[in-house]
Swiss-Prot record:
Sequence similarity: Belongs to the three-finger toxin family. Ancestral subfamily. Orphan group II sub-subfamily.
Cross-referenced Gene3D superfamilies: CD59 (2.10.60.10)
Pfam families (alphabetical): Toxin_cobra-type
Organism ancestry: Eukaryota, Metazoa, Chordata, Craniata, Vertebrata
Tissue: Expressed by the venom gland.
Name under which the protein is recorded: Weak neurotoxin 5
Amino acid sequence: LTCLICPEKYCNKVHTCLNGENICFKRFNRILGKRYDLGCAATCPTVKTGIVQCCSTDKCNH
């Protein structure tokens, strides 16, 4: 699985996930402004504030 890993909304940097990391995620936090966290995870992350989107195909966290 390959996921995007940039902190910007429009990202072209990809990362090959490690064994056991089967999820790509995108986390957006409105409190901090336009901040995006993208990457790989074993499970979909949970957050107290903001929005998280998870998916399981290559580069799906755009």
